[in-house]
Structures are given as structure tokens and as C-alpha cells.
């Protein structure tokens, strides 16, 4: 929106051409989203407390979690508001990638909002039934996949690139592309949701991965950088640095209130949306495998749940003391802050490995 305005006004005030630069708009996007989160956050927390929109805690979970009962939840709405406003202000709104990512994020957030609303307002412990949750996730994920395939104009937009290998890619037909995109978006959404069980555990890795994806988006959209680094050149993806920057700013602002001991939880409205956002950006910049690496914490949490359920159904025994994985470490006696920070450290290492794929071929 402001880009369009500055383009018009730059005819009269040449200094406004500085707003054409992606890097400046990305920085402003980060700061705008951060400011919105910090300003609106206290107001939202008070309102959530006033209307008793608090977190319910399972009796069979770690006993240390019982003190969290009643903590305001659905705070992920704050993140989505900050991301949406900042993106609409600073991104090029004629860019199709911006709209695809933003709409997928908000629609997954809507699914999470309904789930949270039924749990905490209607006092329905099941929330949105799983079959309906996955149905709507599938509809949105598949629709996004079809849109991206139909609007693709170059082969590299629908190819799978293997990191750490020089000029190695797999051409995907419509079926494989749509299936891969669907699984990345829906899988990423649910993986982040499973990780969101401790104060700040999900949001900081999300911020770090989003920051790394912003780098991939910028480099992929720049012909010279992309050719030098042997990554696919995808015109237009550079604008996603604005969205990723807004996510980083909004996430850091939310972490201000979500850090241990949390004043607010993001709920499904935030976790499902942020996971879908990461998956969609990774698909657009053709870094699905790198997302799998950088989001290793999310992957481990998801695999722990799958293994736990499979083991119990097949043998009647559990592999972990409790799943997802972070609860296993809690029940082993690790204090919550230790679990959180160590998972953050793991994410830092994995993100650096993912970024190393830019140069190691």
C-alpha cells in the first residue's frame, strides 16, 4: 500500500524512491509488526483475561503445568494482526506470492481460531473435531498448491531442488507438485502446533526459520545472487522478505509476553497459521528440504508423537514418557526453561546448516 503511494509521490519528492528498496521495506516491516505487537499485546492480554479466555491444562500432563491453567490463550491473533497490517503496508500488493502466503496464513489461523473458541469459550474440550480440522486444512493446502502450479510460468517454479548438490533437481508433474506442496503446508502447520506446548518453545524457532527463509526468498528473487549461488532464480519471490520480516517482528513482539513464565499463549490460531506460513514460503522459494532441516525441532516433535501412538497401538507400550518430545524431557526432570532454551539452541544449529546449503555444493 505504502509502496504504491511512494511510487506516486516520488515523482514530486525524489527522496521517496528509497522505499523501492526491498531491504529497507523489510526492516520497516519488522519494526512495524514488532511495534504493533508490543502496543496491542497488553490490551489483548487484559481483554482475554477479562473474558476468561484461558488455557485448560490436562491433568495427566507434567504437574508443573497445573499453574498455567487460566493463562490467556488465543494470543496468536495478535501475531496475525501484526503480520497482516505490516505486510499490507510495506509489500508490493501486485505480487501474487504475497497474497498466496498471506491468505494461507490467515485461513489456517481461522481454523485455529474456531478450534480455540470451541475449547475455551464454549468449554468443549474436543474443540473443532479432528476430521473437520484436517478437512479444511486439506482444502486450503490443496487450493494453494493448485494455484501455485497453475500460475507457474517457469520450470524451476515446479521443480524439487536438492540442497548441498550442484545443479540437481527433480522435475515434478502436476500430481507430484500438488501432493508435495499439500504435505509441506499441512504438515508444517501441524508440526508447529504440536511444538507449541511450552512458553516460547514454538515461537522462537518459528522466528529463526522465518528469518532464514527471508534470506532464501531475497536471494532467489535476485538473478545475480541466484546464479552465483546455484539456486533457482524465481522472479518476484524477493517480496516475501517483507512477509517473513513481518513474521519475525510479530513473533519477537509476541515472545515479549510469551517468554517464561508466559502471560499469554498463542493457541491454535497462532500455531497452525505460523506453521502454514513457513511451509508456503518454503514451497514458493523451492526449499522444502531445507525447511525440513531448519525446522528439525518441529520434525522431531511430530515424529515423537507418531512413534508414541504407533508403538502403543502395536505393542501396548510407550517409547517416551509422554509425547510430544518436550514433555518427555520435562518428565525426566528437566526444568521448563532448560527444555526451551536447548530446543532453541538446536534450532540455531539447524538453521545455520540450512543456510550453509547456499554455499556448500
UniProtKB/Swiss-Prot annotation:
- Membrane topology note: Multi-pass membrane protein
Give TM segment ranges: 26-46, 73-93, 97-117, 134-154, 168-188, 200-220, 237-257, 264-284, 289-309, 340-360
What does this protein's UniProt record list under function? Catalyzes the initial step of the lipid cycle reactions in the biosynthesis of the cell wall peptidoglycan: transfers peptidoglycan precursor phospho-MurNAc-pentapeptide from UDP-MurNAc-pentapeptide onto the lipid carrier undecaprenyl phosphate, yielding undecaprenyl-pyrophosphoryl-MurNAc-pentapeptide, known as lipid I.
- PROSITE patterns in UniProt: MRAY_1, MRAY_2
- Put simply, this protein is called Phospho-N-acetylmuramoyl-pentapeptide-transferase
- E.C. designation(s): 2.7.8.13
Q: What is the lineage of its organism?
A: Bacteria, Pseudomonadati, Pseudomonadota, Gammaproteobacteria, Pseudomonadales
Pathway membership, UniProt: Cell wall biogenesis; peptidoglycan biosynthesis
Q: Where does the UniProt annotation locate this protein? A: Cell inner membrane
Q: Which UniProt keywords apply?
A: Cell cycle, Cell division, Cell inner membrane, Cell membrane, Cell shape, Cell wall biogenesis/degradation, Magnesium, Membrane, Metal-binding, Peptidoglycan synthesis, Transferase, Transmembrane, Transmembrane helix
- The species this protein belongs to is Marinobacter nauticus (strain ATCC 700491 / DSM 11845 / VT8)
Obligatory cofactor(s): Mg(2+)
Q: Which NCBIfam families did the record assign?
A: mraY
GO CC list: plasma membrane
List the GO biological process terms.
Answer: cell division; cell wall organization; peptidoglycan biosynthetic process; regulation of cell shape
- Does the keyword Flavoprotein belong to this entry? no
Amino acid at each position: 500500500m505504502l509502496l504504491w503511494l511512494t511510487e506516486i509521490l516520488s515523482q514530486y519528492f525524489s527522496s521517496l524512491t528509497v522505499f523501492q528498496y526491498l531491504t529497507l521495506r523489510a526492516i520497516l516491516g519488522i519494526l512495524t509488526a514488532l511495534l504493533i505487537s508490543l502496543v496491542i499485546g497488553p490490551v489483548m492480554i487484559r481483554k482475554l483475561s477479562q473474558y476468561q479466555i484461558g488455557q485448560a491444562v490436562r491433568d495427566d500432563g507434567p504437574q508443573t503445568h497445573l499453574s498455567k491453567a487460566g493463562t490467556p490463550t488465543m494470543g496468536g491473533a495478535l501475531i496475525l494482526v501484526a503480520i497482516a497490517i505490516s505486510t499490507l503496508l510495506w509489500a508490493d500488493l501486485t505480487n501474487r506470492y504475497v497474497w498466496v502466503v498471506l491468505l494461507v496464513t490467515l485461513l489456517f489461523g481461522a481454523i485455529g481460531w474456531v478450534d480455540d473458541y470451541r475449547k475455551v469459550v464454549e468449554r468443549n474440550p474436543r474443540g473443532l473435531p479432528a476430521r473437520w480440522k484436517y478437512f479444511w486444512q486439506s482444502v486450503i493446502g490443496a487450493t494453494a498448491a493448485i494455484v501455485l502450479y497453475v500460475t507457474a510460468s517457469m520450470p524451476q517454479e515446479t521443480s524439487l531442488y536438492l540442497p548441498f548438490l550442484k545443479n540437481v533437481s527433480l522435475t515434478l508433474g502436476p500430481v507430484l507438485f500438488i501432493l508435495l506442496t499439500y504435505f509441506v503446508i499441512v504438515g508444517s502447520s501441524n508440526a508447529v502446533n504440536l511444538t507449541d506446548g511450552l512458553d516460547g518453545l514454538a515461537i522462537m524457532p518459528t522466528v529463526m526459520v522465518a528469518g532464514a527463509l527471508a534470506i532464501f526468498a531475497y536471494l532467489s528473487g535476485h538473478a545475480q545472487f541466484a546464479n552465483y549461488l546455484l539456486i533457482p532464480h524465481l522472479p518476484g519471490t524477493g517480496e516475501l522478505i517483507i512477509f517473513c520480516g513481518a513474521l519475525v517482528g510479530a513473533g519477537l513482539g509476541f515472545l515479549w509476553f510469551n517468554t517464561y513464565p508466559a502471560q499469554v499463549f498463542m493457541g491454535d490460531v497462532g500455531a497452525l497459521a505460523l506453521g502454514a506460513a513457513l511451509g508456503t514460503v518454503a514451497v514458493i522459494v523451492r526449499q522444502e528440504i531445507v525447511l525440513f532441516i531448519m525446522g528439525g525441532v518441529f520434525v522431531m516433535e511430530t515424529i515423537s508423537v507418531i512413534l508414541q501412538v504407533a508403538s502403543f497401538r502395536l505393542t501396548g507400550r510407550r517409547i517416551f514418557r509422554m509425547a510430544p518430545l518436550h514433555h518427555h524431557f520435562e518428565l525426566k526432570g528437566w526444568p521448563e526453561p532448560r527444555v526451551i532454551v536447548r530446543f532453541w539452541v538446536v534450532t540455531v544449529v539447524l538453521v545455520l546448516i540450512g543456510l550453509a546449503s547456499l554455499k556448500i555444493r
